[in-house]
């Protein structure tokens, strides 16, 4: 397999892996994973949002839960479909970085490291860089 095809497959794999991960998390919030889900319903996810964002005022927690859900749904679809790939990947990287930072503040640094949140954010940054404008003979 040549380098160009290998790179394209790697980018496609990263887009699909990140996109499906976002959509899986959203599906779990609405009970679509059934007994295999962690949250199983939106109320439980909202409680988790409050724990992760323990430094935020209580009145903003429902907004954060819905905003995260809407962002993850849009980013998941955008990554899989390939819509505005650079900007969607960069947005995913920022969202994951913010989530990891909130986890670190509320639970300690081990939590986002154990769940590979910063690793996923870094993968999204790499994806954004690869999706940028190309120049040169092999682009």
Regions found by a protein language model. Name each.
Residues 1-42, 51-70, 74, 81-139:
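Extended, low-polarity transmembrane helix blocks
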